[in-house]
Amino acid sequence: METASFTIEKIIDGGTAETNVFKQFLFGDKILLIAHGQVIAGFDLSQLSEKDVTIEGTNIRLSLPAPQILVATLDNTQTKVYDRSKGILNPGDKDLETKAREAAEKSIRDAACEGGILQQASDNARKQLTAFLMALGFNQVSIEIPSASC
């Protein structure tokens, strides 16, 4: 069950870190990637069992598993290489863009975690499930969600 989504843009600077301008000119290999991505958080409801649901008349108690990141992905249609520079004696690392994209995916995931995506997933699930269960006729709804970290 998806309950929170963040869309994030990050700038990733990768490649060799030559501090000497001359060495960078000859041997450097740098990339600047503008990454757009989405992180979706929610709950794996396949972890629920009968013991996680207690019904007494019109009261219901539901114990959900901890929220988790379900998807963290780059939008390849919007993620672009802004700049790529290679030294005149360097053919370039053919995997540099792949490495930058992997770093971008991790950075986007970390940014969502720092932005509180798991807490937002918990809050949204509690609101949505409470409204749904009350619409089904339950008068008192208790939803327990353990805290989680990325």
Q: Which residues does each predicted region cover?
A:
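Domain-level marker for long, solvent-exposed, non-transmembrane regions
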Residues: 1-150
